[in-house]
Amino acid sequence: MVTANLRFVVKVAYEYRSYGIKMSDLIQEGNIGLMKAVQKFDPDKGIRLISYAVWWIRAYIQNYILKSWSLVKLGTTQAHGKLFFSLARTRRELEKFGSGDAAVNVDDIARRLHVKPGEVREMEQRMGGRDLSLDAPMGEDGGNSHVDFVVSAAAPQDDEFADKEEAGLINARVRAALMRLDPREPFIIEQRVMNERPMTLKELGEHFGFSRERARQLEIRAKDKLKSELAALMAEVDPEAVAAQQ
């Protein structure tokens, strides 16, 4: 199963080519994520392998990028990771609808990404300024530096890519976590949360043959377990980052 999906790993890795990391390294990390997914994959859950594996592939690649950029202290928590990959897009969204006050925008960005305003300012300086670590040559040939590969804030196509990237990653994470739940719990989550036309508690109870109140209790339990499994997935990919958040 690993060999059959190697080309997909290359495709995903190519999406991260702008971060100044060798493609061979990105592909290698993606392959590790794929192997992890294959080890944990359960075909009886009714989810396609590639839908499950994409979360692991992206998670390992993103984690590697963050660690590669750690020489400029970008941060290792999940919130810092989101800040790194979403800062430029989030700022443009807020400036588009705001007053143009940079201080207000920084506070808004910090609230949206669950970090401190000072962390936003520091990240912007490190990603967009002339930081010595970013300007250092990446290879022995003294050619490109890390800053040369940072996504340009002026590129409009990056907005669409970032939106799809974040939505796809969230969906893949949820799908991966759903596979860890008891057999009927994924159905409850999908029917009550993920469907465009959610089942009512009464309909859910009738489907399984129990009361509306019992359906409500099972929904709460399924949601709590899903949150726990999502946290566990993050810990498996990068336990240091999860520990830093606690």
Swiss-Prot record:
GO terms for molecular function: DNA binding; sigma factor activity. A motif (Polymerase core binding) lies at residues 25-38. InterPro entries: RNA_pol_sigma-70_dom, RNA_pol_sigma70, RNA_pol_sigma70_r2, RNA_pol_sigma70_r4, RNA_pol_sigma_r2, RNA_pol_sigma_r3/r4-like, Sigma-70_Factor. PROSITE patterns: SIGMA70_1 (PS00715), SIGMA70_2 (PS00716). Signal peptide: none annotated. The keyword Transferase does not apply. One of its GO terms (biological process) is DNA-templated transcription initiation. Keywords: DNA-binding, Sigma factor, Transcription, Transcription regulation. Residues 201-220 bind DNA. Belongs to the sigma-70 factor family. Sigma factors are initiation factors that promote the attachment of RNA polymerase to specific initiation sites and are then released. This sigma factor is essential for late-stage differentiation of M.xanthus. This is RNA polymerase sigma-B factor.
